[in-house]
Amino acid sequence: MFKICLWYILKKEHILHKTISRYSETFNCSAFPAHITIEHSLNHQEAHDMRGGDIETYNFYPCGNPIQTTTKFGSDTFYAIEQPLKVLDKVGIYHISLAYRMNKEFQAFELAVIGRIEPILKEDLEICVADCHGEVKDWKVLYK
């Protein structure tokens, strides 16, 4: 789907990993590593080059309520519940996804279940390259 991605991945012990797992059970969808996407739809070389570059790490602050977004892949529709994030007083550049589903829209009552998240501090983040070619359940970190 999203080919090779460059992520800020939350450290293993961060509570958002458990939160995303809980939402995946509640909404009957696949769990995935808690992450903030830096870039997606890269090839291996592009991701490797970017990973080796100078990527700044920030503190991220939740801004507003979670929203549903859609991305079309041919005849399929990818739905995501995303929490917009603010960084350096800028909104709309980054988000953290809390749930994903294919071809089944999230309903208003499902969005209402999503709780507020705490700020994500830069010391809780690592930069990694992830393989996001297939279904969400198959996404995996290639290297940090």
At which residue positions do the language-model features occur?
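Histidine-dependent nucleotide/RNA phosphoesterase domain, centered on the 2H-phosphoesterase fold
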Residues: 1-144
